């Protein structure tokens, strides 16, 4: 939160100009929620705790760097995390840059339409959690 307004940490994956949400693979035997916390910590340098599930998206892309090229199908579940501690300069090698954005700016800055939708749902989840605490 900055001045009472929610903020979101977005990443620029290595060698890309895209702004995206952190995500990654679940390790064998790892619960999805723990994977979300771990991947967020690795990719952003920030630690957080799960507030709630936002949604799951499905998409595919062609990995042209593979020979022969292959189509990759992904299913990604996003969770809202509450920031606890950390330093965005401590992100891992998979990421070139991490920045905090006010949530409205994050929605407009996110490169991928499905992730814009996730951010809009996160905004609603944050608002509903704020209402519950009143």
What kind of feature is each model-predicted range?
Residues 1-21:
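N-terminal strand-loop-strand
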Residues 16-18, 86, 106:
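A short, flexible beta-alpha/helix-coil linker loop
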Residues 20-24, 62-65:
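Short acidic, glycine/proline-rich loop/turn micro-motifs
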Residues 21-55:
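The catalytic Nudix box helix
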Residues 45-86:
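Active-site segment of metal-dependent pyrophosphate-handling enzymes
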Residues 78, 82, 89-119:
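NUDIX/MutT-family hydrolases
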Residues 121-129:
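C-terminal alpha-helix
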